[in-house]
């Protein structure tokens, strides 16, 4: 197996690109560094391709290591033929490899092994080869002290044949593929659990093809099983099929071993092999495969939403008042300056409105507040109303109020990091600081919180946690490096996400900065303890120094490319300060004049783009939603209302939108646009401000159906999208339920158990 060739085919890249990328990864280079500064070597592979390459490279190398172990084991047994070696070396996945190894894998003594020890292998061979109808007569010649009668002999021979059938790698592969492609998953409610498991009611009698089951339904059904509400099984033939009828799977086994139709004993052996041995194993494997596929899908959705949220445009460096709403414990307030430094805190109470207005007015005037960030949790609407009065009552301050997600703020408040940052500040007030800062710069603040706590995941607690953490860490790393950080203001958690750095180095940078003052050049980073040349190479391009000795230090131009810029300056006869940001002068530079063996055209073009707009931020322009006045609770909603909201989550079946009523509404994929939508992310992403119409409100179940097709009429035929409901009703084998809900509700059943858990 040629790993380079496999990766080349999977990534649609040349062997040279793959080889270069693998060498860089093996040498310790990070994905952001390779994607940004080694484009010539990799032929421009982006971070997504490089992440996939690194993941597959690890898998294929593990596969090669496992092959070596398997080959050695079989060789030591003296059973390694040239044909078997070729099959093992050609195996392109771990499942196929283990199928080949199964007959030779050391195992505890089985019934088949005991039967062989008792001399029954020849009997099994004779019965299969000759297929004599008088099996008892055939068994008489194999009786001994360990095999007292014909029944014992035949039982032993059957055990040998069942093991032989079940360990045929090619056969198992065929049956596995057929079962996956044709079987249905059947979910049924556990008797007596109907009331307790009401949230899983859509799956009380549910059938659908396992191969095409969407991830959100798969995870919902699996959660129902784990909570003891649902029983699930794989069905490979109709329930009313007579037990004596041979299934297609049994026919395949019989055909493989040339078992005649008229040989009852061998047919029974085949049936037992399938039903008691092979199917049970493949069923577990298929459900595991379903879970793995659903995990991957859900993690991909989570990662995409997280990326969108992290790359939401910052409000900017403005003094901000953060409000963490609450009733009984009051509204926690914190003022931070334009750099995020804490200036003041106070707790006010909604039931003391006049005092609250006076206190906040004083804070705003005293510190020159420009932005008010309001957490979107309990009492958010009441707090927002007070903030609105402040904005209207203090026009001279030029105030703006914005409701922001407070997901994870309480977790940050109680974290060790928050305790180190604010050792003398009450835990409840730390959340207000986080809310203020995440408005100023969402990325810089959200990196302090475990990504799983940010609240943009689909069944995040049900998926593989190691895989989830790895994927989300990669997203955070890519986002931080795409934006870059100011080394003189960045926190240690933010610096730790920079290419080449870790927690220790990040803390060392902050400690050096605190002791020696701001860095005035990138070169000074080399004075930080344990930050050597290799780390500097990986990190420097993503670290910005504004107002330093070298103007290029404020850009994404890597220090290794400064000599190229020097040549450009010499050609133009101007200084760096005169060129940087001067679009007209940059346009006069011909990229091809500066390419050489080390720096190709992609790098030169990147340098010119950076010179044209140094330190450019890939995040878009800051925008906010204006929630409708008087709409505070789900009970305030009316069908037909057109509202503005913020996309909080994007799933494969649609988008969840925060419209300010403490319960996100769902825009089903069919209601996102007047044209066909394959992927909701083609239309929206987390953080987008959108206009929606209310189609249906189910206050009891806390479900809100929305549409972005503002000309849709509630209950109108043109927006009834029955494909999903009909397929579910058809496969469930039951009478379709009355469908008097808007189409968006067709996907809300299990998914509306709010993704943010």
From Swiss-Prot:
InterPro entries according to UniProt: HHH_9 (IPR041692), NA-bd_OB-fold (IPR012340), Ribos_protein_bS1-like (IPR050437), RNaseH-like_sf (IPR012337), RuvA_2-like (IPR010994), S1_domain (IPR003029), S1_Tex (IPR044146), Tex-like_central_region (IPR055179)
Classification via Pfam families: HHH_3 (PF12836), HHH_9 (PF17674), S1 (PF00575), Tex_central_region (PF22706), Tex_N (PF09371), Tex_YqgF (PF16921)
GO molecular function, one term: mRNA binding
GO cellular component: cytosol
PROSITE patterns: S1
Region entry Disordered, spans: 711-757
Biological process terms in GO annotation: nucleobase-containing compound metabolic process; translation
Domain S1 motif: residue ranges: 640-709
Basic and acidic residues bias spans: 711-741
Keywords: RNA-binding
PANTHER family: 30S RIBOSOMAL PROTEIN S1 (PTHR10724), S1 RNA-BINDING DOMAIN-CONTAINING PROTEIN 1 (PTHR10724:SF10)
UniProt protein name: Uncharacterized protein NMB0075
Record lineage: Bacteria, Pseudomonadati, Pseudomonadota, Betaproteobacteria, Neisseriales
